[in-house]
């Protein structure tokens, strides 16, 4: 017997919707804070107890809700942010579906007090999505929402939550991204009474970066910006010497919304190409503005993923912007000093940079107050000492800008010796330099081969003894399809019997006496990839050839050899890292050396 089709109750529908919208406490925080942002808030307090499982309180000074709309706000698909289908394709707000409040209320105890500031406020309480009480409230402009006993009626959901530190980490990550996306809003976040994040809302993105990642990282960041007919990009990129083991420090923000987009992450990594070691990732915050018509945010329940109609163009703009920003800088990292010396130096730097006229004992630390400040709905909060630290933070000043028109990105260095036949020691008026000789020549060779491969020269060297290569049938078929692409990197395959190719010539710039080895490795590189990209094949080939043709460690060099290597390195377009992202050169300034030997105190 066929089962009858019935319409689900609103309570059950809301629970189903909550399964997509409210996955964990961080989802509640995200939705409620985004509502506060859409309401025009300038100050938002987030108070969390037990990673949100006990209580989540959001207080804002936004526009508030009219008394007659309070109950309506908890109906599914009730929203003030869009009115018709056309609005759906030009979304300017973070929320627009009208699902968050009813979904959250359906799986928790929720209390809300709100007012527009013009009349008395309204207070409403719900349990499991049902209104328990609605009455008059305070007239303070803004909204306060308290969510407790989350998932009380869906115990299965509780079983899938992680540990408290993990759930707290998820909340912190969400708020960090929101703060980066909205530097003009003051976010004050505390957990069990302990402040975890505090931004002053003055619109300075660099100060938000300092509040989240630390002052030392903010001081290593440089402004980046680019613009085209469709996109406007601004933000901060941290120098390659400061990097991380995962992509979590990459923040891409589109029209005020933090999003995850693999293509944009790849574009950012391309901008840092050869500047980062393998397996390391940059710290970067990009704010991207575009017409809402070319971005679809209605493709993911949590709106974390978007669909871009001009994704490739945006990616190219980002990559080029990052490359140009770093190409202007002198990216020589400073040598590490002893931990004790570092602590002394750090203390002195803070004293000089931020509080020059005050004794060291008065220097405050970020978020040193034991509890979060009492909520003040005013737009103008009283200045705090930690705000002063951020406001007076000096910008990063690259040495390269002192000689803006100079084509040489590293100074003239004079070799004074070699250590373990691996590292070159050199000096000039700026201090001591240590150069990895293999990495230095690898960078030089890489740029040479990259240029040669890109030219696709037809000047060929005939082989006295042609090379015959045999392959399994599947590899033979793949190579047959990709012969044209292989020719663009200097591999000219001719069919030679069953499952075999013959190579009769190679470009004249191939490394002498290593021609066959190079040809085989290029072919192996092409076969190892699921699909052959000519750009990647050229890049990988240049890296491979530069590594094999460069001097190795334990190779003694004469003074003339070292001078020639350093002079050639100065002519490289990116002389600071090898193609794999390892540093080529490290500097110890004269001042640092004098501090080590206590010549200055």
From Swiss-Prot:
NCBIfam families recorded: mutl (TIGR00585)
Keywords: DNA damage, DNA repair
Matching SMART domains: DNA_mis_repair, MutL_C
Highest taxon of the lineage: Bacteria
Protein name: DNA mismatch repair protein MutL
Biological processes annotated in GO: mismatch repair
One CC-aspect GO term: mismatch repair complex
Similarity-based family: Belongs to the DNA mismatch repair MutL/HexB family.
GO MF annotation list: ATP binding; ATP hydrolysis activity; ATP-dependent DNA damage sensor activity; mismatched DNA binding
Coiled coil: none
Keyword Glycoprotein: no
Described purpose of this protein according to its UniProt entry: This protein is involved in the repair of mismatches in DNA. It is required for dam-dependent methyl-directed DNA mismatch repair. May act as a 'molecular matchmaker', a protein that promotes the formation of a stable complex between two or more DNA-binding proteins in an ATP-dependent manner without itself being part of a final effector complex.
């Amino acid at each position: 017997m066929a089962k009858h089709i019935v319409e689900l109750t609103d309570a059950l529908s809301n629970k189903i919707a909550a399964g997509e919208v409210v996955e964990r406490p961080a989802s509640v925080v995200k939705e409620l804070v985004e509502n506060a942002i859409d309401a025009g808030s300038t100050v938002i307090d987030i108070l969390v107890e037990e990673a949100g499982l006990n209580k989540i309180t959001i207080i804002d000074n936004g526009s508030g809700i009219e008394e007659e709309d309070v109950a309506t706000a908890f109906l599914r698909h009730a929203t003030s942010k869009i009115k018709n289908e056309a609005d759906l394709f030009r979304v300017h707000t973070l929320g627009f579906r009208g699902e968050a409040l009813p979904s959250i209320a359906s799986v928790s105890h929720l209390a809300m007090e709100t007012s527009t500031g013009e009349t008395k406020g309204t207070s409403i309480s719900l349990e499991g999505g049902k209104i328990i009480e609605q009455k008059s409230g305070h007239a303070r402009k803004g909204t306060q929402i308290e969510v407790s006993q989350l998932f009380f009626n869906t115990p299965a959901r509780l079983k899938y939550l992680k540990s408290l530190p993990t759930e707290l980490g998820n909340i912190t990550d969400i708020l960090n991204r929101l703060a980066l996306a909205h530097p003009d809003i003051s976010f004050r976040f505390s957990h069990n009474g302990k402040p975890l994040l505090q931004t002053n809302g003055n619109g300075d993105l660099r100060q938000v970066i300092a509040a989240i990642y630390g002052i030392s990282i903010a001081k290593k960041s440089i402004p980046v910006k680019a613009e085209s007919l469709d996109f406007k990009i601004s933000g901060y990129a941290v120098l390659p010497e400061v990097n991380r083991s995962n992509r979590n420090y990459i923040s891409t923000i589109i029209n005020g919304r933090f999003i995850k987009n693999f293509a944009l992450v790849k574009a950012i990594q391309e901008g840092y190409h050869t500047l980062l070691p393998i397996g390391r990732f940059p710290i970067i915050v990009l704010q991207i503005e575009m017409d809402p018509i070319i971005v679809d945010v209605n493709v993911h329940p949590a709106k974390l993923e978007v669909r871009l109609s001009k994704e490739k163009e945006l990616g190219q703009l980002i990559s080029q912007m990052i490359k140009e920003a770093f190409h202007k800088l002198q990216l020589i990292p400073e040598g590490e000093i002893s931990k004790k010396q570092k602590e002394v130096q750090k203390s002195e730097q803070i004293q000089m940079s931020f509080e020059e006229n005050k004794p060291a004992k008065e220097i405050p630390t970020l978020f040193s107050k034991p509890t979060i400040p009492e909520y003040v709905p005013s737009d103008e909060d009283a200045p705090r000492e930690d705000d002063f630290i951020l406001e007076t933070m000096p910008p990063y000043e690259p040495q390269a800008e002192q000689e803006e028109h100079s084509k040489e990105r590293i100074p003239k260095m004079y070799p004074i010796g070699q250590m373990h036949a691996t590292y070159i020691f050199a000096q000039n008026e700026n201090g001591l330099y240590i150069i990895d000789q293999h990495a230095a020549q690898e960078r030089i060779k890489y740029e040479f081969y990259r240029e040669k491969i890109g030219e696709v020269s037809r000047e060929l060297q005939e082989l006295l003894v042609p090379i015959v290569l045999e392959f399994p049938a599947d590899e033979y078929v793949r190579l047959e399809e990709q012969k044209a692409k292989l020719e663009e990197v200097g591999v000219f395959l001719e069919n030679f019997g069953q499952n075999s190719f013959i190579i009769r010539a190679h470009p004249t710039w191939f490394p002498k006496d290593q021609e066959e080895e190079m040809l085989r490795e290029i072919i192996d590189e092409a076969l190892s990839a699921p699909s052959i990209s000519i750009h990647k094949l050229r890049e990988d080939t240049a890296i491979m050839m530069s590594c094999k043709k460069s001097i190795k460690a334990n190779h003694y060099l004469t003074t003339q050899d070292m001078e020639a290597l350093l002079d050639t390195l100065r002519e490289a377009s990116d002389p600071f890292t090898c193609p794999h992202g390892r540093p080529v050169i490290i500097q110890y300034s004269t001042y640092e050396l004098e501090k080590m030997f206590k010549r200055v105190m």
